[in-house]
């Protein structure tokens, strides 16, 4: 147990800013601070420095608080915290060092805030009633049995950045593009459907959206450069670059809710990609609020880096464990989010995840909220040894309704993602991987990869990481990768067949099927296996390509429809082909074999 964890008290009361009927309360947790000052601003523009300052009073258990008699909805704010210099080992570059009294003063936004202005530099007091789009109070998640679940992953920008997608120019790359219900390719009347209309026709039940909390790699004022967003700044605030006005903290909330409501109206549930394992930088808001507490340290005193991003968050520490659980419940309750995908879940402790499961279950309809993540990390971390992390070794301690991505299925079907030209079952090595693929189809029962129930296993062959499925197939099914047909314009019938079989295996396997958006129309990134900060053009969904390759989309549509009609695919019940003649038991079977022409189900 670390010194700060052993010596600092845990605070159980509300944190952040709370707008009450007759006033506003500001509360932060900063046990080592000797003074905390609240600064109030009229605007979110960091160039406008005119402010009113108020000293917070020390409360119980390491908290500081100020109660105002005014309802300060729409007011922006930040904090100035003063610490003994000895309490701050990682001094921010903008800190004020007071040599005379041996203190350091640090500015920070509120890490517990629910709204903020441009680039998250100032937090905002929010009146949630004013952020509800029309019809929000009647919004309900679609009732979808877990056995019918089919997950489609996308990015807010990728979904609508293509100028041929038919989205209004002001909605491209924004939350509001999901509210455009009748878009077509190039706005042609009766043309190929794009956006929400396309999703409804495809038949997927859940859309997993890559990070849409406030992240740091994109300038919200300009919307550039492009980034996936795996660099959190404010966990409980929507990303401003996806809104039509990043300076007004209420707009991003309203438009994010509108996106979710539109998906619900289309019969689709929403899964939020969350990144509680690290933050944008070592010098983050939580570290500024309580230096040395929220981030893990290695044995030499530096930041632990199992995430590969410079800092690992200490989920096992009580106040960050509480932060994670509170954050998940908040997004589910306030935004009607239907599920959570945990980035590098192998860096989070199983106790926190299990507690989150219990708290989400308490919400109305909460038991239907999905939880799953990546059971691995980028490198070793330095968690407290009494806690078990949710990696492949520790995942057996997870609640039976917390799942994980099955890389065993992925690599067996298409080949190891770490070896770009290594084929799998569908693209060159059917004999080598046949037994593993049989295990995949059966949900890995009887193997080390099995879960407490088959619903814990996310079956997939493509996600935002690594090569797209099409690019992997192109690289492994041609002798010269320099001439890979990424555009799918030549003689690629054998590659299309491999793509189709891969989809068939995933969509008839036990567990929950998952796909990267565009997999169903041979999405390409031209061999780029990590496009997180490449151009919007490389990453966006090419709706013209979708129209051109609609025959493959029809194959996916058929598979999805068959799976949804037959829950036996989900729970993995299998038949013996030599079953007794005349048996009355309901039976379902699929047969797959690798061929060089598009397959049919048998």
Region annotations inferred by a language model:
Residues 164-187, 472-492, 535-537:
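A solvent-exposed, charged loop/short amphipathic helix patch at secondary-structure junctions
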Residues 357-517, 521-522, 530-532, 567-570, ...:
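Conserved alpha/beta catalytic core and glycan-binding cleft of carbohydrate-active enzymes
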Residues 29-35, 465:
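Short proline/glycine-enriched turn/loop motifs at strand-loop junctions of beta-rich domains
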Residues 22-26:
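Structural beta-strand segments of beta-rich domains
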Residues 1-21, 59-173, 177-180:
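The feature marks proteins involved in alpha-glucan
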Residues 157-335, 341-364, 369-370, 381-382:
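Substrate-binding/active-site clefts of carbohydrate-active enzymes
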Residues 150-152, 207-209, 270-272, 340, ...:
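Hydrophobic faces of well-ordered beta-strands that scaffold small-molecule active sites
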Residues 8-11, 511-528, 546-602:
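Glycan-recognition and catalytic regions of carbohydrate-active enzymes
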